[in-house]
């Protein structure tokens, strides 16, 4: 038996089995990106929709950096922001329209309404996830206009 035949009969089937095994193992476990998406959406729901600091803080890293200029850093900054929302906008809800993940970042495209007659706001929230915890947040907020120059909508 020559080297090519040995390869064909032994090495190639073993390599194929290894590739299939790795693919099956990967399919059985959620990817890190999917896990990060879950963490960000559950954190968002607890903090913004339910306004539940105790639930939201379970997802918070020990050092939470905030880039929204109206919110302070850290757990106490988040607590104060949730208290503000609960007091000032108790009916505010965010409907997550899209979730995008890349590396350690998760982006939420959200339609936020306050339970009044206004069309709400379009919000893009960006969360950085580290070791399964939310450690950083950015956002961009835009009012949804009553009339637009096109019929495409914001969502």
Predicted regions and their residues:
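Bacterial N-terminal signal peptides
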Residues: 13-23
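Bacterial N-terminal signal peptides that target proteins for export
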Residues: 2-15
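C-terminal and inter-domain tail/linker signature
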Residues: 26-155
